Amino acid sequence: MTEKILDATGLLCPLPVLKLRKHLKSMKIGDVVTVLADDPAAKIDIPHFCNETGQTLISQKATGSCATEYQVRKEI
């Protein structure tokens, strides 16, 4: 399993999800990506994207800054 970090801070909807989708294409099944995003819409968009595409949202937590950290495992 490989873990990668995708920094989407400063990007507004829908760019964090679009970056995540593009990044997932280059990952192997079982790999985990940590997405950092500070757009409030990402709190809804990233979990919804994972649910709709069959990926696993492992965790979603606020960081020390105003960003939120999302851990996503590629399943398909």
Give names to the regions the model predicted.
Residues 1-3, 30-34, 67-69:
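Intrinsic-disorder/low-complexity, polar/charged segments enriched in Ser/Thr/Lys/Arg/Asp/Glu/Gln
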Residues 6, 21-24, 45, 63, ...:
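Residue-level detector of intrinsically disordered/flexible regions characterized by low predicted structural confidence
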Residues 7, 36, 71-73:
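Generic structural detector for well-ordered beta-strands
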Residues 47-76:
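C-terminal structural segments of small proteins and small subunits
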